[in-house]
Amino acid sequence: MAKAETACSSARVLLELGDVDGASNRANYAMFDAARAALLASGEGAVGPADPGRTHSGLIGGFGLHLVKSGKVSREMGRLLNRAHEIRQVADYKAESVELEDARELVDQAEVFVGNMRAAFLPDSPAS
């Protein structure tokens, strides 16, 4: 979870510097790392070739299957993770930049997502 929290902090700094694509990338990875930590903490993650966190699509699918559909996390958290991935695709692979408002919203949502994953799956671990 520490990696997710660091990425969240980086996203906020990049946003304040006006780097909307960089902020969007870091916010997405904050959520990716938090989702992966939640899967591992829940016993649904694996290390190695079966690790759902090896790819974005694998992680999103595993998160939806094992945590959202089981009711361990809300559907809203699943939607946020999917939206973050969509915005990162624009930030990293499209000629146009992410809109400033979308980047702001994503950074805010990443902070909420990481906090929710920590509270639900790693409440006793120290925050970074």
Give the label of every model feature segment.
Residues 1-128:
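Terminal alpha-helical segments
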